[in-house]
């Protein structure tokens, strides 16, 4: 059998239904992979029955606790040793699982990934990276929420990880890497962005094209967009909200009269294609890069399709040896200044 993926079945808003259904779909499509659903055994099996039962490559590990989004992440991870997240991280650390997926608390996932699984050597902070649709080909953006208040040297690490992901997963031979800012000029941005710009210019292994404004991201102005976790998350949520508002407005406009309804029927194939392109459930979750094993964060509002897509991201990361390739690339970075060698707190 192939890779073994641990799935937090109690993380989403509608848990465990989306996690169970999405995992079963993935298990049936990829019989060479193994899946472990962690959570309330009886609830998981009840949902599985609705989906036709558990395939042979899916097992259930019963847990008795749950980490909720309103809990302080570090305290919750340390006190709830029998929550799906903490048990899953333990399975990964002990080599009983190769990767972890959760639609639960982002903060708790970052903590459990950092403390439970561990950062890869040379990485100070992990970054959540996700695929975002554009009018051209998709763009990979990081960080979208794992590390707010990032330092310039951390953004350089994010850029390097994003470049590797774009090469190995998106298949781009020379990804265009850009830094999110409030202007394209080198002198634009806050202090961190201004300090990061020359560092990226000096990094020979990536194709840095300079700053990019948020409005240019949907038009495919770059292949990889690097940002601090705070503005990155704001851009991601704005992106999703505008897309949903646009499609809702379009639907109302096209169904407002018999004449527009006829036009909508004629345009339906094209509209469905466009809607699919901008549907976040098609792109799965965000990969938490910088850890010793693949970790994927799905939306709390994920449905079964989004969980399945997140598992597809995981499958690609495992088969593409993304973690190994990231470690190899990070090892090529210049050695840190001795005064910077202290391991930052989680």
Swiss-Prot record:
It is found in: Cytoplasm. One of its GO terms (cellular component) is cytoplasm. It is an enzyme of class 2 (transferase). The gene is plsX. Its main location: cytoplasm. It holds the Pfam family FA_synthesis. HAMAP family: PlsX (MF_00019). Its EC number is 2.3.1.274. Catalyzes the reversible formation of acyl-phosphate (acyl-PO(4)) from acyl-[acyl-carrier-protein] (acyl-ACP). This enzyme utilizes acyl-ACP as fatty acyl donor, but not acyl-CoA. Homodimer. Probably interacts with PlsY. Belongs to the PlsX family. NCBIfam families: plsX. This is Phosphate acyltransferase. InterPro entries: FA_synthesis, Phospholipid_synth_PlsX-like. GO terms for biological process: fatty acid biosynthetic process; phospholipid biosynthetic process. One of its GO terms (molecular function) is phosphate:acyl-[acyl carrier protein] acyltransferase activity. It catalyses: a fatty acyl-[ACP] + phosphate = an acyl phosphate + holo-[ACP]. The keyword Cell division does not apply. Pathway: Lipid metabolism; phospholipid metabolism. The keyword Ribosomal protein does not apply.
